[in-house]
UniProtKB/Swiss-Prot annotation:
Name by which UniProt lists this protein: Reverse gyrase 2
Active site, UniProt feature: 903 (o-(5'-phospho-dna)-tyrosine intermediate)
Gene name, Swiss-Prot/TrEMBL: rgy2
Zinc finger (RG N-terminal-type): 1-40
Helicase ATP-binding domain: residues covered: 96-285
Regulation: At least one of the 2 proteins is inhibited by actinomycin D. Less sensitive to NaCl than TopR1, maximal positive supercoiling is observed with 100 mM NaCl; as NaCl rises higher than 400 mM supercoiling decreases. At 600 mM NaCl relaxes but does not introduce positive supercoils into negatively supercoiled substrate.
Zinc finger (RG C-terminal-type): 662-689
Xref: SUPFAM superfamilies: P-loop containing nucleoside triphosphate hydrolases, Prokaryotic type I DNA topoisomerase
A GO CC term attached to the entry: cytoplasm
Note accompanying the cofactor annotation: Binds 2 zinc ions per subunit.
Domain Topo IA-type catalytic residues, every copy: 759-1157
Keywords assigned by UniProt, alphabetized: ATP-binding, Cytoplasm, DNA-binding, Isomerase, Magnesium, Metal-binding, Nucleotide-binding, Repeat, Topoisomerase, Zinc, Zinc-finger
Binding site for Zn(2+) 2: 665, 668, 679, 682
NCBIfam families tied to this protein: rgy
Native source organism of the sequence: Saccharolobus solfataricus (strain ATCC 35092 / DSM 1617 / JCM 11322 / P2)
Length: 1166
């Protein structure tokens, strides 16, 4: 039996505890030796029961905190029920838990989900020293009345620390002196826009929160230093130290300020003071997140507003910005002439009050993202439809817009300028670099950082080329896939559709009401067909089911009835089930990718870890998820002196691996797993511990309904999931494993719909592999250190035979050194080896011409290769681009985490029905559908591992276009290599779904001299089928005499091994796995056993490597041989498939090591 033990991890005493106990939500045996009868009780009852038992046995320690939090939440929920008369919804429970935990955050939910009720009830619960800030006096009076109804002692219009104070932004600004360092318990901001827009108001809020002036100024200074020096040649150690000092000062004060909650915001902070406030509070005000749409989208090809007459009262007309204020007045008058009461929705709230009360029929406003008509109206019963007068657009002067490198690139390409030299430099820019370049170009200032200054000069040159080229154009309109360039009165403008304004504005007609989403109607009066088509395309990418229906094809009478019906008390609305969750992934990039995929997430920083809150809509199911990265493994086998290298093997055969939290030294960057508070390598106390992540995850798990663990879909990912589930189960009993093989909306939704239990067979396989690696590695490494008197010696079961291959080839290569003549025959190379230089000279002198005869020729069918597996991708990338395996894996990891390819650690060539559809879609786009031949390649269950393939039907050129149009869409920084590898994966996959090609195989006789004939068969032609996407190398040798090109170099009759050779051997001999190919070679290099040749990337053994291998193979051949390693790999696979018992395999390994190693330890000649 294997009994996993976690060091210092009991949720009560902090002692050692088994994984089984943690998964059952129990403390360790020392705290609670025996208990039964609580397995089937709910989580809250279990916590209470355990608390009482621990308390009665005088064992209560840290478990008190868990009990306190649970009971506090219960108290707050009961108070809410008593005050409101109903049970809080799942989302309200999430907010109440955060509030009760004294967290500062933004409520990013739309109106109708109980934000105001939650905040008011909690304010009354606290009872005093609460400040509730609202934008207007009328809203202040409404809030005061509601608070009084809930039973609060209210101070309306001024601050009284013994009451709940409700004030306006105006009061905050006018009473600066009286609010300095009041530091109330709880501060609510109903509408954060006034704070975000005004630096002065931010100053006042900072004072109110109790933030000392010097701490606030330090935050401002820190932001300025980061902005100034991040890309500067003056980013010295002195500047870095100053930044560290400021960060430390701010971190020490963060938990000492008032709790701040922002109920809503429509814009994000941009000013330096607002960014300082974000730094101090740990979160930024985020805009209301879109949960779902229930809207009929329509359009008409004219600007006729007479439709208002048919639709009647309850409309909002949004006028495209370029028409100006005069058009708003003109439309208002037109509507009034139709017999309706109309009012401009430009500023203030009076228009909304009148509209709500039925005094106004139609509102007229500007289609502006920041306008009150687009963001400030929430009238679910009254507002039924929105009419856009003109397609909503963003219009800017073209030459100003060209200061953005990505805009310059897109415009340049559109007008035919060759940007090939500049493209890759622009594509790899991060957001900060783009901003710095933009502002330096606009201001005409140089950049104190050579690389960016050089790029700025190049951008200025290309800007002048674009301007000159535009002057040559006779057309007044230039159209691209994502924007339009127009010429008006001699000036050029760039125009984009404003999709966000369309979404927000049309969303005014579809609001949450009585737990359901009302039906809305949106009509665009199209004034620019090109811009409308771009908008339609963008909308369909975001909401695939979106369809814009021509107004002439709609039944307005029927729509009007449906609009009215959805606003009745028991009307037909779209109802949702909202649940809250914590989604844990491995990497920060993946967390960001998933969060951005579904909505514009809000971010808060907890314990220096970003927590993304996002909304995932799946039909009528809505998930409000916190997404956090564990950063891979959180524990590893302990380095403490326990058992045999951290694993106890007991007399009854029980195996107890002890795991300790992973720590990273921030000075030497080494990683270790022990209880030590100092780095064992350099002695530094500047450490980063996984305990910080665990504490955060436990805190978040307490606040949500469910925990979803979404680590990678392999044995390592399963072990990570097991560890996380162990640490979190005492805090939330609803812990699930979710698995996906690609990061796409469809895959994430499918994973959430089908949560699973953790696969303990995969976990056991990983545990056996890790223990075996520890035992073999530590045992042999210590013997090597003794033998060779040095550090950085290591050995492993897989590494050693691989080292042996490279050592043997290196020795043979060196022993057969001589001279090599390369003869180039029209692109086909012939290699000749000579041991002596004089023979080379003789050969060259006799080689005057080469005579080529074509002996035969035949037509053959060429089959496409299967899509890539891990090994074939590494081999192809090395052969084609000479890239090392670890770099290819790093790039593939980036592409996977960006959602561009499926999981890259796979040995399957299987292609799912989803993958086949992607190939079909692409071939249809490229007019190659006749070549489509669907292949699954190998049978497998749907949802199982697939080959490496793209997740969408976009080739590398379309990907580049996407990056140009939206540089911040992906959460990775692209390089030229990312594009090369993506292109390789994409083309190989598409080719695998295409028809055979027809080739010509030709046999040639090449006569190089007397008795020196070379007979070769070469592919001389290939066409049709998959060749159209994935060309193959062909040789078309000319018949007759030619003058060959000759190159002479030192060389050997033996060939060294390349990366691709080693990976092929690992695969064929059964000792490699997708997760170990690159890592094995990388580890051999780290130990200094092998090096890679610069020009051809051959792997060469060093003298150190040769000595180590000779020692290991002579003393431990049976332990590290190919056959033994291959058998172990098979056993690990069998454990994962539940065919073998894990503890049996480990006991065999332990016996094997003891038998071979113990006698050697006593030898004097080690």
């Amino acid at each position: 039996m294997i009994n996993v033990m976690y060091k210092n991890s009991c949720p009560n005493c902090g002692g050692d505890i088994s994984g089984d106990r943690l998964l059952n939500g129990l403390p360790c045996e020392a705290c609670l030796p025996y208990i039964n009868g609580i397995d089937d009780v709910d989580h809250i009852s279990k916590v209470k029961t355990l608390y009482n038992i621990l308390l009665n046995n005088d064992k209560i320690k840290n478990y008190w905190n868990l009990y306190y939090n649970i009971t506090t939440f219960e108290t707050v929920f009961k108070y809410f029920r008593d005050k409101t008369g109903y049970e809080p919804w799942s989302l309200q429970k999430l907010w109440l838990r955060r509030l009760a935990s004294n967290q500062s955050f933004t409520m990013s939910a739309p109106t109708g989900l109980g934000k105001t009720t939650t905040l008011m009830t909690y304010s009354v619960f606290i009872g005093q020293d609460v400040v509730y800030i609202v934008p207007t006096k009328s809203l202040m009076e409404q809030v005061c009345k509601r608070l009084e109804k809930l039973g609060a002692q209210v101070s309306c219009g001024k601050i009284d620390q013994k009451k709940v104070s409700v004030i306006t932004i105006s009061y905050l600004n006018k009473n600066a002196d009286s609010i300095v360092s009041l530091k109330p318990n709880f501060v609510v901001i109903d509408d954060a826009d006034a704070v975000i827009k005004s630096g002065k108001t931010t100053d006042r809020l900072v004072s109110l929160l109790g933030i000392p002036k010097d701490v606030y100024e330090s935050a401002i200074q820190l932001i300025r230093l980061r902005n100034k020096y991040y890309f500067s040649n003056e980013y010295t150690e002195e500047v870095k130290e100053k930044i560290r000092e400021l960060e430390l000062k701010i971190a020490e004060f963060k938990d000492k300020i008032s709790q701040l909650v922002i109920a809503s915001a429509t814009i994000r902070p941009k000013g330096i003071k607002q960014k300082a406030l974000r730094l101090l509070t740990g979160f930024e005000p985020s805009s209301i997140q879109l949960y779902a749409r229930n809207i009929i989208d329509a359009y008409t090809e004219n600007l006729d507003l007479s439709i208002v007459k048919e639709l009647g009262s309850g409309g909002l007309i949004l006028v495209s910005k370029e028409y100006g204020r005069s058009k708003l007045n003109e439309i208002k008058k037109y509507v009034e002439d139709l017999g309706f009461n109309a009012k401009l929705a430009i500023s203030g709230r009076k228009f909304l009050d009148d509209f709500s009360q039925g005094k106004v029929d139609i509102l007229v406003g500007s289609a502006s993202y920041y306008g009150v008509a687009v963001r400030g109206i929430d009238e679910p019963k009254r507002l039924k439809y929105v009419i856009y007068y003109g397609v909503p657009k963003i219009r800017a002067k073209l030459f100003d817009a060209l200061s953005n490198p990505f805009t310059l690139l897109r415009v340049g390409k559109l007008i035919g300028i060759d940007f090939s030299k500049l493209q890759n430099k622009i594509l790899i820019l991060n957001p900060s670099e783009v901003q710095l370049l933009k502002f330096s170009i606009i201001k005409g200032e140089s950049i104190n950082y050579h690389k960016l200054e050089q790029l700025r000069q190049e951008l200025l040159y290309y800007m002048s080329l674009v301007k000159d080229k535009l002057k040559e154009k006779v057309e007044d309109t230039l159209i691209s896939d994502s924007f339009v360039i127009t010429k008006q009165n001699g000036n050029y403008y760039i125009v984009y559709p404003d999709m966000i304004t369309y979404l927000q504005g049309s969303g005014r007609a579809s609001r949450l009401y009585n737990g359901g989403l009302t039906l809305g109607f949106s009509i665009i009066l199209v004034d620019d067909r090109h811009i409308f088509e771009i908008l339609e395309k963008k909308m369909q990418k975001l909401f695939p089911n979106t369809t814009f229906t021509s107004l002439s094809n709609t039944n307005l009478s029927e729509i009007k009835i449906k609009l009215e019906d959805s606003r009745k008390e028991e009307g037909n609305r779209v109802h949702f089930n909202i649940s809250t969750g914590l989604l844990i992934v491995e990497s920060p990039t993946k967390a960001k990718t998933i969060a951005k995929m579904f909505s514009r997430p809000s971010v808060r920083i907890r314990n220096k870890v970003p927590v993304y809150e996002t909304i995932i809509v799946d039909g009528n199911q809505i998930y409000v998820l916190d997404i956090v990265a564990s950063k891979g493994h959180i524990v590893d086998l302990t380095l403490e002196d326990i058992g045999y290298y951290g694993i106890k093997v007991e007399d009854d055969g029980t195996i107890k691996p002890y795991y300790d939290l992973i720590k990273k030294c921030l000075d030497c960057n080494k990683i270790f797993s022990s209880a030590s508070d100092k780095c064992p390598y350099c002695g530094s106390a500047n450490l980063q511990s996984a305990q910080t992540t665990i504490n955060l995850l436990r805190e978040l798990a307490l606040s949500v309904d469910k925990v979803f663990i979404a680590s990678d879909p392999d044995t390592e990912g399963e072990k990570i999931a097991y560890d996380l589930a162990s640490f979190l189960s005492p805090y939330n009993s609803n812990v699930y494993r979710v698995v996906y093989h690609e990061i796409t909306k469809k895959a994430i939704l499918e994973a959430l719909r089908n949560p699973k239990k953790i696969n303990t067979n995969l976990v056991m396989s990983q545990i056996v592999r890790r223990i075996e690696d520890r035992w073999i590695g530590f045992t042999l490494s210590n013997l090597l250190k003794t033998k060779f008197n040095g550090h950085n010696h290591g050995a492993g079961r897989v590494q050693t035979p691989v080292l042996g291959w490279i050592v043997n080839k290196t020795i043979k290569y060196k022993s057969a050194m001589g001279h090599v003549v390369y003869i180039d025959i029209a692109g086909y190379s012939i290699k000749k080896y000579f041991s002596e230089k004089r023979k080379v000279e003789e050969y060259i002198n006799n080689l005057q011409v080469a005579r080529i005869e074509k002996i035969s020729e035949e037509k053959i069918l060429l089959s496409p290769l299967p899509p890539f597996t891990t090994d074939t991708l590494l081999i192809e990338a090395n052969m084609k681009y000479k890239l090392p395996a670890n770099l290819v894996m790093k790039i593939a990891q980036d592409l996977f985490e960006a959602g561009l390819i499926t999981y890259h650690r796979t040995d399957s060539t299987h292609i799912s029905s989803v993958g086949i559809e992607i190939a079909k879609e692409y071939l249809q786009k490229q007019a190659l559908i006749k070549e489509f031949v669907p292949r699954s390649w190998e049978s497998s269950e749907e949802g199982a591992h697939e080959a490496i393939r793209p997740t969408r039907a976009i080739d590398v050129n379309e990907l580049i276009q996407e990056i140009e149009e939206n540089p911040y869409k992906y959460s990775i920084r692209f390089s030229k290599l990312h594009l090369l590898i993506y292109d390789l994966i994409f083309k190989r996959f598409i080719a695998s779904q295409m028809s055979h090609a027809v080739g010509t195989k030709s046999r040639y006789l090449i006569k190089l001299g007397k008795d020196d004939n070379v007979d070769v068969e070469l592919l001389s032609n290939a066409e049709g089928g998959f060749i159209k996407v994935y060309p193959v190398k062909v040789y078309n040798l000319p018949v007759g005499e030619i003058q060959p090109k000759v190159n002479i170099t030192k060389g050997s009759s033996e060939q060294l091994l390349s990366y691709s050779d080693v990976i092929s051997l690992m695969k064929s001999k059964g000792i490699g796995r997708p997760s170990t190919y690159a890592k094995t070679i990388e580890n051999l290099m780290k130990h200094g056993y092998i090096v890679s040749s610069k020009r051809k990337s051959y792997l060469i053994a060093t003298n150190r490597g040769i000595s180590v291998y000779q020692f290991l193979s002579s003393k431990f051949y049976d332990l590290v041989s190919e056959s033994t390693t291959s058998r172990l790999m098979t056993k690990l696979d069998d454990i994962a498939l539940s065919k073998l018992n894990a503890s049996t395999v480990l006991l065999e390994i332990f016996s094997e090591i003891s038998t071979l190693v113990n006698p050697l330890k006593s030898e004097q000649n080690v």
